[in-house]
Regions:
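Pro/Thr/Ser/Gly-rich low-complexity, intrinsically disordered linker/stalk tracts
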Residues: 397-437, 492-505
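C-terminal tail/sorting-segment detector
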Residues: 505-512, 526, 566-591
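Catalytic domains of carbohydrate-active enzymes, especially glycoside hydrolases
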Residues: 95-121
Length: 591
C-alpha cells in the first residue's frame, strides 16, 4: 500500500484441461522421456528456474523505463537516521542515500521517483510548506542541507533520472504540521475525514495551489519529472457529484499542474500513479476498485490529451488481476510511456508472502508488451526480498535509456564533433568530443569490438546521460567507441564514431522471441520460428501459474488455440529429455 492506496490482491480459478501428450510421441519417445515431460508440464518449473532469464527471450531493450518509488515518509526507504545539522549527521544521512542509489544503479534502474512533497511537507527548503520531519526528526526543522538537490546531483552522476514525487490530495493527520499550516492559510481548502486532512478536490483553488508547489520545484531544481501521487478522490470521500463531474474535477487539478510545469520547463516529464486497474474490462471485473469509475481518475484520457506524458499504474495484483489489465494499459497508451508498478512489497512474508516468480513473470510480460516496470518500493528491492534484487540484476543485464518524448519534440540534436581518444599507460582510455549546444545536452557513450558501433544494441551502452564532454574508461581491451548527444526530451543524435579500435566482429545471437506478445487472434497462435539449436518437438501452453492447458507438436507456423479459454498464457517448448524453455507470452482474446 502506497500512501494509503488500496490494493486488493485476489485469486482467480482457471479452467482445467487434460491434453493427450501420448499421441505426440507414440512412436518416437520413450516412457522415461514422457514421464519427465509430464512432470515438468504438470508440476511446473521450480521457482529458481522460473526466475532465470531464458536464453530464448529477446535481449534487454535499449529503451525501457526501469523505475522505483523511493519513499521518505517516516524514513521507511530513506533516511534511516536523523540529521541535526552537524557535518557527521549530514554525511551519514547522505551516505545512506548514495548506498541505495548505487544498489539501484547496479540493478538497472534508470528512474528514481523520490517522495518530495510528503504530507503538505517537503524535503527541500520551500517558501510554501514546512520541512518534513523525516530528515531531522522534527517537522519544520531543517536537516542542515537541501536533500532534494543532493538526491538530484547523485542520481545524475549515475545516469539516472530523478522525478519529484508529489503527494497531492492527502495532507496528513489533522493536527500535523503540514495540515495545520494549510488549514490556517486556506481554511476552506482542507476537509477532515476521520483523523486525516485532505485538500478538497472540488475546490478550484486546490489545482492552483498544487500547481504553485510544482512550479516551485521545477523552477528551483533540475528535476527530470513531476510525479503526482493520490491525484484522485480519497476512497473514504462520499462523492455527491456525478462521476462525470468528479472526473472533471480531478482532471482540472491535473491539467492545472501540467500546464504550469510545461510553461516553465516543457521537457519535464509529467506523470502520475493511478489505481492499477483503469476500469472494468469486458471479461475481467476490477472487483470494485478502479481508477476511472471509483475514484474519478481518468488517467488513460490524460495520456491521450497530453495532460500526462507517462503513467505508473499501481498494479499490486497477480494472475488474471494483473495480466489483462496490463494489456489494457498498453492498448490505451497512445504511444506514451507506461511503467506499471509491481507489488514487490508483497514478496515480504508480512505483506502478501508472494513467491518470487509472481513478480518475475510479471516483469517478463511487461517487457514483452513493450512496457516498463516500477518497483514498490525501494527497500523491498534493495533488501533482496526473496531474491528479487538478484533477479533484477540478471533481468537488466544491459543498461536502458528512458524512451524519448517525441510527442513533445522529435527534432534530433546535432551529433557531437571532434572526437579524441587517448589511451593511458595504465590502460585507461579517455574520450573527448565537442558540441555546439553543450549547455542543454547530455551524452550516451557506446563501445563495441565491431565497427561501426551499433547504438541500437543495448549491450554496447557503457554510460548514459553523461553531463560532460569527456569521460575516462577503465581498461577493458581494444574497442571502438561512439558518442551521441541527447536533448532533454530524450531525442538522441546520430553517433560520432571513433576510428581507432580493434577486435573481431561478433556474430548475432540466435533468438526466438519477438519484441512483444506472440501473435494470436483468439483461435490461431503464431509459433516462433524454431532455431537449429533447439531440439524441442513439443510446445506446451500453460497458465502464468504453470498449469498445463494443452500440448501440441512444435511444427508449422501456427497452433490451434480455439479450445483454450480466454486468458493470458505462456508458451514453452519441451524436448525429448524433458528440458523446457519459455518461448513467449500470448493472450487469447475473442470478440
Amino acid at each position: 500500500m502506497k500512501n494509503g492506496k488500496k490494493a486488493v490482491p485476489l485469486s482467480q480459478k482457471s479452467s482445467k484441461t487434460t491434453p493427450n501428450v501420448m499421441n505426440l510421441y507414440r512412436s518416437t519417445t520413450s516412457l522415461y522421456a514422457l514421464l519427465l515431460i509430464l512432470l515438468c508440464a504438470f508440476c511446473g518449473l521450480s521457482t529458481q528456474a522460473q526466475s532465470q532469464p531464458s536464453l530464448f527471450l529477446q535481449p534487454s531493450p535499449k529503451h525501457e523505463v526501469r523505475a522505483v518509488w523511493l519513499t521518505t515518509i517516516g524514513g521507511i526507504d530513506w533516511p534511516h537516521s536523523y540529521s541535526n545539522g552537524s557535518a557527521t549527521s549530514i554525511e551519514r544521512q547522505q551516505r545512506e542515500l548514495t548506498t541505495i542509489l548505487d544498489q539501484l544503479k547496479a540493478a538497472g534502474t534508470n528512474v528514481v521517483l523520490l517522495q518530495t512533497r510528503v504530507r503538505a511537507t517537503t524535503i527541500y527548503p520551500s517558501a510554501m510548506e514546512p520541512w518534513d520531519g523525516c530528515l531531522s526528526g522534527n517537522p519544520g526543522k531543517s536537516p542542515g542541507y537541501d536533500a532534494l538537490q543532493f538526491a538530484i546531483d547523485e542520481c545524475h552522476k549515475r545516469g539516472m533520472q530523478l522525478h519529484a514525487w508529489v503527494v497531492t490530495i492527502p495532507v496528513g493527520k489533522w493536527t500535523s504540521a503540514g495540515c495545520m499550516q494549510l488549514r490556517k492559510r486556506y481554511p476552506k481548502l482542507i476537509k477532515k475525514i476521520g483523523p486525516d486532512g485532505y485538500m478538497d478536490p472540488e475546490n478550484m483553488q486546490t489545482g492552483s495551489y498544487l500547481a504553485d508547489i510544482c512550479e516551485e520545484i521545477v523552477r528551483n531544481y533540475d528535476v527530470d519529472g513531476i510525479h503526482l501521487d493520490y491525484i484522485r478522490y480519497p476512497e473514504t470521500w462520499k462523492i455527491k457529484v456525478s462521476r462525470t463531474q468528479g472526473r472533471r474535477n480531478i482532471t482540472a487539478i491535473a491539467s492545472a499542474i501540467s500546464r504550469r510545469v510545461k510553461s516553465v520547463k516543457p521537457w519535464v516529464m509529467m506523470s502520475c500513479s493511478p489505481i492499477g486497474k483503469s476500469d472494468d474490462l469486458r471479461r475481467y471485473s476490477s472487483r470494485g476498485w478502479n481508477a476511472r469509475t471509483v475514484v474519478c481518475q481518468d488517467a488513460q484520457e490524460w495520456l491521450r490529451t497530453g495532460v500526462m506524458d507517462a503513467l505508473f499504474p499501481m498494479m499490486y495484483f497477480r494472475d488474471n488481476h494483473f495480466y489483462p489489465f496490463a494489456v489494457d494499459w498498453q492498448e490505451q497508451s497512445y504511444g506514451k510511456i507506461v511503467a506499471p508498478g509491481l507489488g514487490t512489497y508483497m514478496l515480504n512474508r508480512h505483506e502478501g508472502n508472494w513467491p518470487l516468480n509472481v513478480v518475475t513473470q510479471e516483469m517478463y510480460v511487461l517487457r514483452s508488451l513493450g512496457l516498463g516496470h516500477t518497483h514498490f518500493r525501494s527497500k523491498f528491492l534493495t533488501d533482496n526480498t526473496k531474491g528479487i534484487y538478484t533477479f533484477a540484476r540478471r533481468f537488466n543485464q544491459t543498461p536502458a535509456v528512458v524512451p524519448p518524448m517525441t510527442w513533445l519534440s522529435s527534432t534530433l540534436p546535432d551529433a557531437p564533433t571532434h572526437f579524441q581518444q587517448h589511451k593511458h599507460a595504465s590502460g585507461e582510455v579517455t574520450l573527448a568530443w565537442q558540441s555546439a549546444d553543450a549547455a542543454h545536452l547530455l551524452y550516451n557513450i557506446y563501445a563495441s569490438r565491431t565497427w561501426p558501433v551499433d547504438i541500437d544494441d543495448a549491450r554496447n551502452i557503457i554510460a548514459t546521460r553523461h553531463t560532460s564532454q569527456q569521460i575516462t574508461l577503465a581498461p577493458k581491451g581494444n574497442f571502438f567507441y561512439a558518442v551521441t548527444a541527447v536533448d532533454r526530451y530524450g531525442n538522441e543524435s546520430k553517433p560520432l564514431q571513433s576510428v581507432e579500435g580493434a577486435g573481431a566482429r561478433t556474430g548475432a545471437r540466435e533468438l526466438i522471441a519477438t519484441d512483444g506478445l506472440l501473435k494470436c487472434d483468439g483461435y490461431k497462435l503464431t509459433l516462433p520460428e524454431k532455431p537449429s539449436t533447439l531440439d524441442a518437438n513439443v510446445v506446451c501452453i500453460e497458465t502464468m501459474q504453470g498449469k498445463l492447458m494443452t500440448s501440441l507438436p512444435y511444427r508449422g507456423k501456427y497452433a490451434d488455440v480455439s479450445k483454450v479459454p480466454e486468458g493470458f498464457y505462456q508458451l514453452r517448448s519441451i524436448n525429448k529429455r524433458g528440458i523446457t524453455h519459455r518461448l513467449g507470452f500470448f493472450m487469447v482474446k475473442r470478440r
